[in-house]
Regions:
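Short, compositionally biased
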Residues: 42-49, 79-90, 146-167, 187-200
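Conserved "cap/hinge" positions at secondary-structure junctions
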Residues: 20, 34, 69-70, 89, ...
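The Walker A (P-loop) glycine that initiates the GxxxxGKT/S ATP-binding motif of P-loop NTPases
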Residues: 235-236
Length: 351
């Protein structure tokens, strides 16, 4: 069936129903309407497919086209994520500001990584090497404090048949070719894509045997947090939950911080961005942003993107975890994420 065969059947806030066949699968990414708004399939029932749209749906009407992308909702991973700020579906907000001004325009399909910036790449493999999932094939300095390690993707193993020369490359230029046991040749670059709702595989979960030093003596003494563990900060409005998370993000001894503002107030994310840019990391004496990724999905942004932003942050955090770094993921707040889930559930007419 051709792509034009899918059309909008109905619109209910961020939820759009689609007709035209049975070719769409759960979690498939689609572009909705004339402006090609980004959406994701959340229900398939008979000949009717339900899509949640991550942008404002004002102006959509029945009969407009829906274009399937043929892949699940994914984000781009590679050098350039650190020292950057993204929205809930991993679009860089600084590039969005250049293209559309202070307000986010609809239908902006912007890649997460800069296509023109070059990185000084050193190859870690040579022709004839046998490689498997998780093996390092290249590395480059991403910031002044973090070296980016490019790893063989999950599910790929084989023999290296070609490597590029060490030098400067963009995220789209091939670095290594690997031939698998079936004879297929895979070209590996600095960047790769990963579905946000698929956990990155791991061999085993290591036991928690060392503390995360948060820099807050009362937490480290009375409520210690283990590296590899989790902690929650419950409390009423105005109790200082966000300020506590800011302190943990600034001074904890993690290698990388992924700070996720899920439905937070815009001024709180602005404060975090300003402070992280000015403060120095006590270990490296470099700005804190050199080891930080900010994901800003504030309360005035579409509610569907708020739901996806948590998975975006987890995918980025797991990506750097696989490189061997200690990564601290701060999600603020879980209650507003649950609020987004409740609203989506209501739009889907679920109990």
């Amino acid at each position: 069936m051709s792509q034009a065969a899918y059309t909008i059947h109905g619109v209910n806030g961020p939820v759009v129903t689609v007709t035209g066949g049975r070719g769409l699968a759960m979690m498939d990414m689609v572009n909705v309407g004339e402006e090609e708004l980004i959406g994701e399939v959340v229900r398939v029932e008979g000949g009717l497919t339900t899509v949640q749209v991550y942008e404002d749906t004002a102006g959509l009407m029945p009969g407009q086209p829906v274009l399937p992308q043929g892949a699940p909702m994914s984000i781009e991973l590679g050098p350039g994520l650190l020292h950057n700020i993204f929205d809930g579906i991993a679009r860089p907000l600084d590039v969005i500001q250049e293209k559309s001004g202070p307000f986010i325009s609809r239908g902006l399909n912007i890649p997460s990584l800069d296509r023109e910036k070059t990185w000084q790449v050193t190859l870690s493999v040579k022709v004839g090497d046998e490689v498997g999932p998780g093996a390092e094939y290249a590395r480059c300095p991403e910031t002044a404090v973090i070296t980016h390690r490019c790893l063989i993707p999950a599910g790929l193993s084989g023999q290296v048949t070609w490597t590029a020369q060490p030098g400067e490359y963009t995220v789209e230029e091939p670095l290594v070719e690997v031939q698998d046991r079936h004879g297929a040749v895979h070209r590996l670059k600095l960047a790769q894509r990963w579905p946000i709702r698929t956990p990155r595989p791991m061999a085993q979960r290591l036991p928690i045997d060392r503390p995360l030093i948060t820099g807050q003596r009362i937490i480290d003494t009375l409520f210690p947090i283990g590296k590899g563990g989790a902690a929650a900060i419950p409390g009423p409005f105005g109790a200082g939950k966000t300020m506590t998370q800011h302190q943990l993000a600034k001074w904890s001894d993690a290698d990388i911080i992924v700070y996720l503002g899920c439905g937070e107030r815009g001024n709180e994310m602005t404060q975090a961005l300003e402070e992280f840019s000015q403060l120095l990391d006590p270990k490296s004496h470099q700005p804190l942003m050199e080891r930080t990724i900010l994901i800003a999905n504030t309360s005035n942004m579409p509610v569907a993107a708020r739901e996806a932003s948590v998975y975006t942050g987890m995918t980025m955090a797991e990506y750097y975890r696989d490189m061997g770094y200690h990564v601290a993921l701060m999600a603020d707040s879980a209650s507003r994420w649950a609020e987004a889930l409740r609203e989506m559930s209501g739009r889907l007419e679920e109990m």
